Amino acid sequence: MATASFNMQSVFAAPSGVLTTRNIRNTNQLFFKRIAPVGVRCMAQGDPIKEDPSVPSTSTSATPPQMPQSPPPPVSKPKVSTKFGDLLAFSGPAPERINGRLAMVGFVAAIAMELSKGENVFAQISDGGVGWFLGTTALLTLASMVPLFKGIRAEAKSKGFMTSDAELWNGRFAMLGLVALAFTEYVTGGTLV
């Protein structure tokens, strides 16, 4: 047993040779056997196993210093599409924002004209409002599409009080308000204000 233990410990102590036992004439004798050097390469991946500091280590060898790991490369944002079909798609960035901007201008203009002339929305449209509507629509659509074709999104430039989310919500309320104004004036037959 002592010979086997000594033999196993000598494997680590003498990397160029190994002590072996041979049975010669019914007696065990130790022999030094020369072996070719063997390279060992560790290919483990992941985090190394950490030892519990409360348990004393039985190993006499010091752990090699850890190589500093480089940080992972930054994740690049996907490029935004600037194709006309993608911008005006149902889930694209342009339709709701453009319609909201038009509704905000339309709601304020309709209320202002009601206060100044006393006409309802339908009378305003029939008195030359179609030309103003088409001109405003073309101007706001073009002004809204130019930054989108350059790849600039409203979300990237929104800070402080006037954010892109606030613009979307104001546009949604203006769309509802304009429809509610027209419906109320149609049902009552007169102006709201």
UniProtKB/Swiss-Prot annotation:
GO cellular component: chloroplast thylakoid membrane; photosystem I; photosystem II
Annotated stretches, region: Disordered: 46-80
GO biological process, one term: response to far red light
Location, primary (coarse class): plastid
Membrane topology annotation: Multi-pass membrane protein
Induction cue: By high-intensity light, mostly at cold temperature (e.g. 4 degrees Celsius) (at protein level). This high-light-mediated accumulation is inhibited by okadaic acid. A stepwise accumulation is induced when 40 percents of PSII reaction centers become photodamaged. Induced by UV-A, red, far-red and blue lights illumination in a phytochrome A and phytochrome B-dependent manner. The COP9 signalosome is involved in dark-mediated repression. Accumulates upon heat shock but repressed at continuous high temperatures.
Regions that span the bilayer: 102-122, 129-149, 173-193
InterPro entries referenced in this protein's UniProt entry, alphabetically: Chloroa_b-bind
Comp. bias regions, Low complexity: 54-64
Biased composition (Pro residues): 65-76
Subcellular location: Plastid, Chloroplast thylakoid membrane
Keyword annotations: Chloroplast, Membrane, Photosynthesis, Photosystem I, Photosystem II, Plastid, Thylakoid, Transit peptide, Transmembrane, Transmembrane helix
One Pfam short name: Chloroa_b-bind
Knockout mutant characteristics: Reduced greening during deetiolation in continuous high light, with a reduced ratio between chlorophylls a and especially at the highest irradiances. Slight reduction in the rate of chlorophyll accumulation during greening at moderate light intensities, and lower zeaxanthin accumulation in high light conditions. Normal sensitivity to photoinhibition and photooxidation. Impaired seed germination, especially at hot temperatures (30 degrees Celsius).
Transit peptide feature range: 1-43
Family assignment from sequence similarity: Belongs to the ELIP/psbS family.
Function: Probably involved in the integration of pigments into the mature light-harvesting pigment-protein complexes. Light-harvesting chlorophyll (LHC) a/b-binding protein required to ensure a high rate of chlorophyll accumulation during deetiolation in continuous high light. Involved in seed germination. May fulfill a photoprotective functions. Prevents excess accumulation of free chlorophyll by inhibiting the entire chlorophyll biosynthesis pathway (e.g. 5-aminolevulinate synthesis and Mg-protoporphyrin IX chelatase activity), and hence prevent photooxidative stress.
Protein name (database record): Early light-induced protein 2, chloroplastic
Source organism (scientific name): Arabidopsis thaliana (Mouse-ear cress)
High-level lineage: Eukaryota, Viridiplantae, Streptophyta, Embryophyta, Tracheophyta
